[in-house]
Amino acid sequence: MDIIGQVYCFTGAPHTITCLLREQFINWYIKYKRSENYPAFRELVVMYRLFLALGFLTFINAAGQRCRFTDVERDKGYTGMLLKGRLRKTAGNGRTVELICGRGNHNYTCESGVLKESSPRQARCGCKGILEMLFDMPKEERPSPMYDSVTYDPTPNTPTTVGKDGIWNGVDYRNGSTVKPYCDTGPVINGSSKAVCVSGKWVPTLGVCPKMCSIGSLKENGKFVDVTATTKGDELNPPPREQTLIPIVRKVDKDKVQHGVKVVALCKAEDSTTAAEGVQEFECDNGKWKPEPVPCP
C-alpha cells in the first residue's frame, strides 16, 4: 500500500491497483472490515507494515519536489532564477538553473526541493575585495594615488592565501557588507566614501584618492617668507581604527599636505628683514593651491 498525498493505493485483484481518496478509503475500510474477507484484509495490513519497515513504502509529495526561489536565495544576494534563460519562480527536481548575480550568474541544481550550488565558490552572490579588484586591473588603468587601506563591516573570514602584492586572494564579501576606503592623501573625492555590497556589486561608486599639495612649491612660487598649516590632515581625514586587509605601505613627504588642508602664507615686509605682511590664505584642492597665489613683491 502506498500513500500519495491524501490518496491511498493498495493491491486488489491480480495485476490491479486500487487508489482511493482518504474519505473513500475510510468508508471502504469500515465496509471491508464487516465483510467475510476481513481476515484477508488483516494479512494485507501486515504486509503493508512489513513494506514500511523495510523502506519500500514511499511518500510522494509532488509539490515538494520542485524548487522555489525564496528569501533564502535573496539573502545570499541573488535577485532571481533563470531556467533555460527565462526568469522562473520554480524549477523541477533535477533541473539546473542559474541564480542571477551582479558579477556573474551561478549554477544551481534542484535536488528534492532544495537548490544546491554547483561549487563552494558559488555558495552566495558576494562582492570581490576592493583592493583585489584594483590590482586585477592593468597598471595603466589603476587610479593614482591608490587607496592605502580598506575597512569592511562585517569582517570577512580570514583568507588562507596571500596573493600578488600582498593582497588577499579568494575573499568574498557577503551581500549587505559595507566598505570604506582610506587615503593618506585626504578624503576621497569624485564619489562616495562608503559602499554596500548589493547582488555582487559595490554601490554606489566609490570615490578616488586626491592628490596632495606641496608647501615648498607654494613658498617658492609665491616668494613667501613662511607657509604654515592652520588645519591638520588627520582632523579632516581620521585614519580607520581597524584594517581588514594589508595596507599599502606609502611614504608621505613631510613637505606635502592632504587635500582640504588650509595654510597661511606671509610675505616679507619691505622695510624690515624680520617683519612680515601681505598674509594670504590657501586651501589644497586635489594637488593644486586655491586661490591662485599672488607672488610677494
From Swiss-Prot:
Subunit structure of this chain's protein: Interacts with mouse IL33 (in reduced form).
Sugar attachment sites: N107, N175, N190
GO cellular component: extracellular region; host cell nucleus
GO BP field: regulation of cytokine activity; response to host immune response
Residues in Sushi domain copies: 151-211
Name of the protein: Alarmin release inhibitor
Record carries keyword Glycoprotein: yes
Main location: secreted
Disulfide feature: C183-C209
Keywords: Disulfide bond, DNA-binding, Glycoprotein, Host nucleus, Secreted, Signal, Sushi
Origin: domain of life: Eukaryota
